[in-house]
């Protein structure tokens, strides 16, 4: 797994910071991944989690995406996912991941807003095939967002 490019990339955005938790294969998507805790720097409370998956290929690009995140219910609606994604984009760019694929369920409006605030473009909504592991977890459709990291002014503007 390539070293994580943290030099020159402070993992702090206002009151939110990312702390590296583990580096390991993703338990569902079976690709190397960096797992971070989202921390409210004012209180040191963990407000959520975000991970960056390093693999590419049809499963990642169509169904799983390079990024997964979860925000604790008490912290939703405060921009935690947007701040964390902004920080993760710096790392993805440093690792040469471009474009960054982000997927979410079509009815997950907050996640869709996070993608759109980041400058990601909705490419399509796809049906998840029955033999896909996320189908077995109950996920039937995915919005596919593409975030081009090397387009000037498109990222880090939310």
Task: Outline where the language-model segments fall.
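Acetyl-CoA-dependent GNAT
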Residues: 4-62
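Acidic/histidine-enriched, glycine/proline-rich intrinsically disordered or flexible terminal extensions
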Residues: 6, 139-158
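Conserved acetyl-CoA binding element of GNAT-fold acetyltransferases
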Residues: 61-73
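Conserved acetyl-CoA-binding loop-helix of GNAT-fold acetyltransferases
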Residues: 69-71, 77-90, 113-117
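Conserved G/P- and acidic residue-centered "switch" motifs that form tight phosphate/ATP-binding loops
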Residues: 79, 96, 108
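Conserved GNAT acetyl-CoA-binding A-motif
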Residues: 92-103
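Conserved catalytic-core motifs of GNAT/GCN5-like acyltransferases
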Residues: 103, 121-138
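Conserved active-site alpha-helix within GNAT-family acetyltransferase domains
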Residues: 107-124
């Amino acid at each position: 797994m390539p070293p994580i490019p943290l030099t020159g990339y402070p993992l702090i955005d206002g009151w939110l910071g990312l702390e590296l938790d583990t580096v390991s294969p993703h338990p569902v998507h079976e690709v190397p991944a960096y797992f971070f805790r989202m921390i409210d720097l004012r209180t040191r409370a963990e407000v959520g989690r975000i991970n960056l998956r390093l693999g590419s290929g049809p499963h990642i690009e169509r169904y799983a995406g390079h990024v997964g995140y979860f925000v604790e219910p008490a912290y939703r609606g405060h921009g935690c996912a947007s701040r964390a994604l902004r920080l993760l984009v710096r790392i993805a760019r440093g690792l040469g991941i471009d474009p960054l694929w982000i997927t979410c369920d079509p009815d997950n409006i907050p996640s869709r807003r996070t993608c759109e605030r980041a400058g990601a473009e909705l490419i399509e909504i796809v049906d998840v095939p029955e033999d896909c592991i996320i189908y077995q977890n109950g996920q039937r459709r995915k919005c596919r967002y593409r975030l081009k990291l090397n387009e000037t002014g498109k990222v880090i503007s939310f």
